[in-house]
Every structure is written in structure tokens, then in C-alpha cells.
Amino acid sequence: MHFIAQLRELSGGKPVGFKFCLGHPWEFMGIAKAMLETGILPDFIVVDGKEGGTGAAPVEFTDHIGVPLRDGLLFVHNTLVGLNLRNKIKLGASGKIVSAFDIASVLAIGADWANSARGFMFAIGCIQSQSCHTNKCPTGVATQDPLRQRALVVPDKAQRVFNFHRNTLKALAEMLAAAGLEHPSQLSAKHLVRRMSATEIKLFSQLHVFLKPGELLTGEVNGEFYSRMWQMARADSFEPHEVVAA
């Protein structure tokens, strides 16, 4: 947290935050405890998922290391709400967000905004050849080779990026209107539905635990999982406290 304060000072007060993929839940709660102890808060946090967003992501990492985006986002959102910090820190979400529904789904469970790269990469010609790290991208998107860069015709691709951006936001606006909403900030977990079986559906607000403001501070936590993770978390280390079962 002191490094965040240092960056903020050196940048003349510019917004400072960090992006991460959630690993062990107590590790982020340890960061949250450090926020409380130092009084130093990031301006924003971007939660990424384990889904693997770049063509250079190792196969061993993709889908195997870290927590999926929506699970991680919900945990971070709940932790900040439970500590009365959510209104002081903005939350972004990233990880295989392409369509308007992808955007709406993360806004509904806690994100203030969504980062999207994949769709725009497709718009400029990415074919997912998974050679980003080789400098030999066949479509000229991820390369420093002047010859290969010629494959990317900027005026043509710029129009495609513009069209994708405009139409994605238009689709999001249409989804909001269909739900009777006027602004993305009105989306909540009650607007998402999951089919559990052929005869049962549930709202996300019924499927997941949502902490109330200050709940972690009072100790009266709705859900044993959050209570246990909070007890395990340490402000001075990512190593957990051992919690003895009652």
C-alpha cells in the first residue's frame, strides 16, 4: 500500500490502482486488511480471470491458475462492501469480455466498468494464431516487424474498430431498455438468471452470497466462507493464519 501512495505522490496525484487475478481468497483479504491499517486505498482495482486473454498465455496457466473472472469479481466486490470501502474504490473487470451481454453480466455483479480487448483484436484482424510472443504475427497485429506490420491497413481496421465499438454499446443500450433500465449502473444480480435444471431457474441474487456494508467489520458475517477467509487473512503477509475450528 505504501508503494501505491508513492506512485500517487510521484505522479502528481493521478489515479493509481492495480490489476490482478484472484488466487487464494485470504490473499486479497490480506491486502484489504492492509488498506484498513495504513489508511491507503487504491483508486481502482481491475479483476481479471484465469481464462487467459492473450495469445501468448501458457497452456498450463490458461483455465488452471487463478479464479474465474466472475467468481473473483464477486469476491472482491463483497470484501470491499463488507469493509465499507466499496464506495471509495472503483472496480473494473476483464477477461474474455466481447459482447454486450458479457459487459452487462459483470456490471450486474459488482463491476463499475469492463475492459475489453478480445473483440477489438478480432476487429483489427487477429486470428488467434497464438504467436504474439514470437514477433511473427501473420496479420500484423502483434509484431514489430515492419514487413509484417504492412498486413494491418490502418484506415480499414480503424473503421472496423469504430463499428464494433459503436454496435456493442448500441446492443448494451438495447439490453438495458429491454430490462426496463435507463443506465448500466442500475444492473444488479437480480437481472441475471441461471437455469439449474429443466424445471428450475434461479436469480444470481439467490445463488450467491452478497455481504452488507460493514459486515466484515462487525463480525456478523452472512456466510461461513467469508468469515473464515477474513480470519485467515494477514495484513503483513500472504501466508494465512491458521484457523482452529470451533
Where are these regions (language model features)?
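Glycine-rich phosphate/ribose-binding loops and adjacent secondary-structure elements
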Residues: 1-149
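C-terminal extensions of enzymes
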Residues: 154-246
